[in-house]
């Protein structure tokens, strides 16, 4: 089995820490929390230190931060109903744009692979898609309202302009732009969870999605395209996402976040039972009936709820986590 080794415990935020996000180069990460501040951390020798504190962009808790694929921009989603765009064009990070429109808390933000689109979602049940129109200019391209409850998370597909959202209504929705009229449409609804879907993440290929829920389970979804060799029907020649695996019994409380490593294919979870768990696909797994095993469970990873986990996109096996306990932890997974 594997082992999750704690490398660093970092403090600096006041109160709970909601989100952590690696820079695309893997040598810097950002964190955010209820102190309304963003901290940018870098490795100084063998120690992670706060390089910058951004504290003038939001009036309330910052729920999530995400780096643009080019690494030049950072987007932050806040309970104040706005999304701030930060850039370092002048040498120092500055808030160059504030996106307004959501009626209340913005829960999540995500950049498309090209960096040309940004998605946000909110407690107001809507998903917004923004086009990057030029230097610090963002235009609303779509307001999507297929969810019946609070939308918790938005994540773009790793290679296509396909957006996934997870909601308090127990479903995941997929959105794509119609080639004919340029309207964004809901192209799939993924239903299997029996409670809030807190988070989702694609694998490296984008052919599979993992979801985590208040129902204490993980689900693996497989994309079936028109003409697939498994014989799965695809009405209207639309890709169908089918739940092909449910992973349950390992978590005792809600699973708040999930990260599918693009380098190792390992899945990490952040749980309300203060634990972090790592899952691996078994060697005899089948595409249409995959099986996963728990490699390791770090039961007391934090002293309170673990809110976010994310694998380093460059350094194999490195994981960061953050918690209600006010700490960030850097881990190294060894198999």
Curated annotation (Swiss-Prot):
This protein's record includes keyword Repeat: yes
Record carries keyword Phosphoprotein: no
Keyword tags: Repeat, WD repeat
GO cellular component: cytosolic [4Fe-4S] assembly targeting complex; metallochaperone complex
Residue stretches of each WD repeat: 12-51, 57-96, 101-140, 146-185, 192-231, 250-289, 301-335
InterPro entries: CIAO1/Cia1, G-protein_beta_WD-40_rep, WD40/YVTN_repeat-like_dom_sf, WD40_repeat_CS, WD40_repeat_dom_sf, WD40_rpt
Gene Ontology biological process terms in this record: iron-sulfur cluster assembly; protein maturation
Entry-linked SUPFAM superfamilies: WD40 repeat-like (SSF50978)
Function: Essential component of the cytosolic iron-sulfur (Fe/S) protein assembly machinery. Required for the maturation of extramitochondrial Fe/S proteins.
Family per record: Belongs to the WD repeat CIA1 family.
HAMAP family recorded: ciao1
Protein name, as recorded: Probable cytosolic iron-sulfur protein assembly protein Ciao1
Naturally occurring in which organism (per UniProt): Drosophila ananassae (Fruit fly)
Chain's gene name: Ciao1
């Amino acid at each position: 089995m594997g082992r999750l080794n704690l490398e660093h415990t970092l403090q600096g935020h006041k109160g709970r820490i909601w989100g952590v996000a690696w820079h695309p180069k893997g040598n810097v990460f950002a964190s955010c929390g209820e102190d309304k501040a963003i901290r940018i951390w870098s490795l100084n020798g063998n120690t992670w230190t706060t390089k910058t504190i951004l504290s003038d962009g939001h009036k309330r808790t910052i729920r999530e931060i995400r780096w643009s694929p080019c690494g030049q921009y950072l987007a932050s989603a806040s309970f104040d109903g706005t999304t701030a765009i930060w850039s370092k064009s002048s040498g120092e990070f500055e808030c160059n744009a504030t996106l307004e429109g959501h009626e209340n808390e913005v829960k999540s933000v995500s950049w498309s692979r090209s960096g040309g689109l940004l998605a946000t979602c909110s407690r107001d049940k809507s998903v917004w898609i923004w086009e990057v129109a030029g230097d610090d200019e963002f235009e609303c391209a779509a307001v999507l309202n297929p969810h019946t409850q609070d939308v918790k998370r938005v994540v773009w597909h790793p290679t296509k302009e396909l957006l996934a959202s997870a909601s308090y209504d127990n479903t995941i929705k997929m959105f794509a732009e119609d080639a004919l009229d340029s309207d964004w449409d809901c192209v799939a609804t993924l239903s299997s969870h029996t409670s809030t879907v807190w988070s989702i993440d694609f694998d490296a290929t984008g052919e599979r999605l993992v979801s985590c829920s208040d129902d204490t389970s993980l689900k693996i979804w497989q994309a079936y395209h028109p003409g697939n060799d498994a014989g799965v029907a695809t009405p209207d020649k639309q890709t169908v996402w089918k739940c092909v695996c449910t992973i349950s019994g390992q978590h005792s409380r809600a699973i708040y976040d999930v990260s599918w490593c693009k380098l190792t294919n390992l899945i990490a979870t952040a749980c309300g039972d203060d634990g972090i768990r790592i899952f691996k696909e078994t060697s005899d797994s089948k595409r249409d009936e995959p099986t996963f095993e728990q490699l390791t469970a770090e039961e007391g990873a934090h002293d309170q709820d673990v809110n976010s986990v994310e694998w380093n996109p460059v350094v194999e096996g490195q994981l960061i986590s953050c918690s209600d306990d006010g700490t960030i932890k850097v881990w190294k997974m060894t198999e």
